[in-house]
Amino acid sequence: MPTISQLVRKPRAAKPLKSKVPALGNSPQKRGVCTRVYTTTPKKPNSALRKVARVRLTNGFEVSSYIGGEGHNLQEHSVVLIRGGRVKDLPGVRYHTVRGSLDTAGVKDRKQGRSKYGAKKPKSA
Protein backbone atom coordinates (compact mmCIF):
# COMPACT_ATOMS: atom_id res chain seq x y z
CA MET A 1 0.00 0.00 0.00
CA PRO A 2 1.49 3.39 -0.96
CA THR A 3 2.18 6.18 1.50
CA ILE A 4 0.40 9.54 1.30
CA SER A 5 3.51 11.23 -0.13
CA GLN A 6 3.82 8.53 -2.81
CA LEU A 7 0.19 9.18 -3.77
CA VAL A 8 0.85 12.94 -3.89
CA ARG A 9 3.80 12.32 -6.25
CA LYS A 10 1.93 9.87 -8.50
CA PRO A 11 -1.87 9.58 -8.05
CA ARG A 12 -3.74 6.33 -8.64
CA ALA A 13 -4.39 5.59 -12.31
CA ALA A 14 -8.03 4.91 -13.20
CA LYS A 15 -8.63 1.67 -15.10
CA PRO A 16 -9.52 2.41 -18.73
CA LEU A 17 -13.16 1.55 -19.48
CA LYS A 18 -13.62 -1.19 -22.08
CA SER A 19 -16.24 -0.44 -24.76
CA LYS A 20 -19.26 -2.74 -25.05
CA VAL A 21 -19.48 -1.90 -28.77
CA PRO A 22 -15.88 -1.85 -30.04
CA ALA A 23 -16.81 -2.08 -33.74
CA LEU A 24 -18.59 1.30 -33.66
CA GLY A 25 -15.44 3.14 -32.60
CA ASN A 26 -17.08 6.16 -30.90
CA SER A 27 -19.73 6.53 -33.65
CA PRO A 28 -23.46 6.29 -32.88
CA GLN A 29 -24.08 4.04 -35.91
CA LYS A 30 -22.08 2.38 -38.68
CA ARG A 31 -22.96 1.28 -42.21
CA GLY A 32 -22.22 -2.21 -43.45
CA VAL A 33 -23.05 -4.92 -45.97
CA CYS A 34 -24.80 -8.16 -44.99
CA THR A 35 -22.59 -11.18 -45.65
CA ARG A 36 -25.06 -13.71 -44.26
CA VAL A 37 -28.68 -13.54 -43.03
CA TYR A 38 -29.81 -16.43 -40.84
CA THR A 39 -31.87 -17.50 -37.83
CA THR A 40 -30.47 -18.81 -34.59
CA THR A 41 -31.85 -20.17 -31.32
CA PRO A 42 -31.53 -18.33 -27.98
CA LYS A 43 -29.99 -19.64 -24.76
CA LYS A 44 -32.02 -21.51 -22.17
CA PRO A 45 -34.73 -21.04 -20.96
CA ASN A 46 -35.95 -19.17 -24.08
CA SER A 47 -37.04 -20.74 -27.34
CA ALA A 48 -37.45 -19.01 -30.72
CA LEU A 49 -35.85 -18.47 -34.13
CA ARG A 50 -34.12 -15.10 -33.82
CA LYS A 51 -33.26 -13.27 -37.04
CA VAL A 52 -29.59 -12.28 -37.24
CA ALA A 53 -27.34 -10.81 -39.95
CA ARG A 54 -23.58 -11.06 -40.22
CA VAL A 55 -22.44 -7.59 -41.32
CA ARG A 56 -19.11 -6.38 -42.75
CA LEU A 57 -18.75 -2.76 -41.61
CA THR A 58 -17.12 0.14 -43.47
CA ASN A 59 -14.25 0.09 -40.96
CA GLY A 60 -13.45 -3.57 -41.73
CA PHE A 61 -15.06 -5.18 -38.67
CA GLU A 62 -17.41 -8.14 -39.19
CA VAL A 63 -20.16 -8.33 -36.54
CA SER A 64 -23.44 -10.11 -35.82
CA SER A 65 -26.44 -7.80 -35.75
CA TYR A 66 -29.98 -8.56 -34.56
CA ILE A 67 -32.91 -7.75 -36.87
CA GLY A 68 -35.82 -6.65 -34.65
CA GLY A 69 -39.53 -6.60 -35.50
CA GLU A 70 -41.84 -8.99 -37.34
CA GLY A 71 -40.60 -9.85 -40.83
CA HIS A 72 -37.70 -8.26 -42.73
CA ASN A 73 -36.46 -7.81 -46.30
CA LEU A 74 -32.72 -8.31 -45.75
CA GLN A 75 -30.60 -10.67 -47.80
CA GLU A 76 -26.94 -11.02 -48.69
CA HIS A 77 -25.40 -7.75 -50.06
CA SER A 78 -28.12 -5.58 -48.42
CA VAL A 79 -26.65 -2.32 -47.08
CA VAL A 80 -27.66 -1.80 -43.44
CA LEU A 81 -27.11 0.65 -40.60
CA ILE A 82 -26.20 -0.86 -37.24
CA ARG A 83 -26.36 0.61 -33.74
CA GLY A 84 -25.14 -0.70 -30.41
CA GLY A 85 -27.33 -2.78 -28.12
CA ARG A 86 -26.89 -6.41 -27.27
CA VAL A 87 -29.44 -9.22 -27.29
CA LYS A 88 -29.27 -10.87 -23.88
CA ASP A 89 -30.26 -14.37 -24.99
CA LEU A 90 -28.05 -14.50 -28.12
CA PRO A 91 -24.37 -14.89 -27.21
CA GLY A 92 -22.08 -12.81 -29.43
CA VAL A 93 -24.82 -10.52 -30.80
CA ARG A 94 -23.92 -7.02 -29.57
CA TYR A 95 -25.49 -4.86 -32.27
CA HIS A 96 -28.96 -4.09 -33.69
CA THR A 97 -29.88 -3.21 -37.27
CA VAL A 98 -31.71 0.11 -37.61
CA ARG A 99 -35.11 -0.52 -39.24
CA GLY A 100 -36.35 1.91 -41.90
CA SER A 101 -32.91 3.11 -42.99
CA LEU A 102 -30.78 2.29 -46.08
CA ASP A 103 -31.89 -1.11 -47.49
CA THR A 104 -33.77 -2.16 -44.33
CA ALA A 105 -37.53 -1.63 -44.62
CA GLY A 106 -39.62 -0.60 -41.61
CA VAL A 107 -42.02 -3.05 -39.98
CA LYS A 108 -45.33 -3.26 -41.85
CA ASP A 109 -48.62 -2.50 -40.02
CA ARG A 110 -46.80 -1.36 -36.88
CA LYS A 111 -49.10 0.88 -34.79
CA GLN A 112 -47.28 1.37 -31.47
CA GLY A 113 -43.60 1.99 -30.78
CA ARG A 114 -43.23 2.90 -34.45
CA SER A 115 -40.07 4.98 -34.18
CA LYS A 116 -38.03 1.98 -33.04
CA TYR A 117 -39.08 0.02 -36.13
CA GLY A 118 -38.99 2.70 -38.85
CA ALA A 119 -42.76 2.60 -39.42
CA LYS A 120 -44.57 5.65 -40.79
CA LYS A 121 -47.71 6.99 -39.09
CA PRO A 122 -50.74 5.27 -40.62
CA LYS A 123 -53.21 7.47 -42.51
CA SER A 124 -56.29 7.97 -40.30
CA ALA A 125 -59.56 7.48 -42.24
Curated annotation (Swiss-Prot):
List the GO terms this entry assigns under cellular component, sorted alphabetically: small ribosomal subunit
The GO terms describing molecular function are: rRNA binding; structural constituent of ribosome; tRNA binding
Which Gene Ontology BP terms does the record give?
translation
Please identify the protein, giving its name as recorded.
Answer: Small ribosomal subunit protein uS12
- Keywords linked to the UniProt accession: Methylation, Ribonucleoprotein, Ribosomal protein, RNA-binding, rRNA-binding, tRNA-binding
Thylakoid is among the record's keywords: no
* Naturally occurring in which organism (per UniProt): Nitrosospira multiformis (strain ATCC 25196 / NCIMB 11849 / C 71)
* Subunit structure comment from the entry: Part of the 30S ribosomal subunit. Contacts proteins S8 and S17. May interact with IF1 in the 30S initiation complex.
Gene3D superfamilies for the chain: Nucleic acid-binding proteins
Q: Which residues carry this modification: 3-methylthioaspartic acid?
A: D89
The keyword Ribonucleoprotein is assigned to this record: yes
According to its UniProt record, which protein family does this protein belong to? Belongs to the universal ribosomal protein uS12 family.
Pfam families in UniProt: Ribosom_S12_S23
Q: Where is this region: Disordered?
A: 1-30, 103-125
Q: What does this protein do?
A: With S4 and S5 plays an important role in translational accuracy. Interacts with and stabilizes bases of the 16S rRNA that are involved in tRNA selection in the A site and with the mRNA backbone. Located at the interface of the 30S and 50S subunits, it traverses the body of the 30S subunit contacting proteins on the other side and probably holding the rRNA structure together. The combined cluster of proteins S8, S12 and S17 appears to hold together the shoulder and platform of the 30S subunit.
Protein origin, superkingdom: Bacteria
Q: Which CDD domains match?
A: Ribosomal_S12
Question: In what ranges is there compositional bias, type Basic residues?
Answer: 9-18, 113-125
